[in-house]
Amino acid sequence: MQDVKTYLSTAPVLATLWFGFLAGLLIEINRSFSDALVLPFF
């Protein structure tokens, strides 16, 4: 039961950190390449 409590307390924290990192990465990529239609042609 302790393992389940540990999992439930760490999974949301890890998901929040991961999605925050991913959102920041996508924002920086979008800031560098503002037009997404041009990106596949490079």
UniProtKB/Swiss-Prot annotation:
Annotated GO biological process: photosynthesis
Compartment list: Plastid, Chloroplast thylakoid membrane
Gene Ontology CC terms, in alphabetical order: chloroplast thylakoid membrane; photosystem I
Membrane topology field: Single-pass membrane protein
Alphabetic keyword roster: Chloroplast, Membrane, Photosynthesis, Photosystem I, Plastid, Thylakoid, Transmembrane, Transmembrane helix
Domain of life: Eukaryota
SUPFAM superfamilies xrefs: Subunit IX of photosystem I reaction centre, PsaJ
TM helices/strands, residue ranges: 7-27
One Pfam family per UniProt: PSI_PsaJ
Family according to the record: Belongs to the PsaJ family.
PANTHER family xrefs: PHOTOSYSTEM I REACTION CENTER SUBUNIT IX, PTHR36082
Function recorded in the entry: May help in the organization of the PsaE and PsaF subunits.
Record's protein name: Photosystem I reaction center subunit IX
Organism: Anthoceros angustus (Hornwort)
Classification of source organism: Eukaryota, Viridiplantae, Streptophyta, Embryophyta, Anthocerotophyta
Gene: psaJ
